[in-house]
């Protein structure tokens, strides 16, 4: 990463971590801190933007009349991971883009799936969904930049 001399590093994490039932808050905090510290050391000129994971769902299976039925339930740990990332960002004075909230919060993975933006696994976006996410992040960055320019110009 250092060879690229980035001015901005977007660090998206939390989705996979939210599926771990053994990962503690302290362990997650240490993992985030290890990555951020390494990036700060290797790329001191870069600003770091953390993003929270969107809501996702866990796959469940039940038997109904001897047939297996698959259904999905919201992954409740996403909220915990989201809060941990947001807290870390505040404590370390990092920007944080709250993808969980922006994507629609609780219940949004079903809506994204219906719109064709969330993959069948209810965890990952489709190609179109990732394009939408990228466009939303781009707009948020450009809006924040314009607000900064306007403040500096005053």
Model features per residue range: what roles?
Residues 1-29, 55-56:
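Oxyanion-hole/transition-state-stabilizing segment in secreted/luminal serine hydrolases
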Residues 7-12, 47-52, 95-99:
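Structural recognition of the beta-strand scaffold that forms the well-ordered cores
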Residues 27-31, 77-80:
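Short, glycine/acidic-rich beta->alpha junctions
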Residues 32-37, 82, 86:
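Generic structural signal for well-ordered alpha-helices
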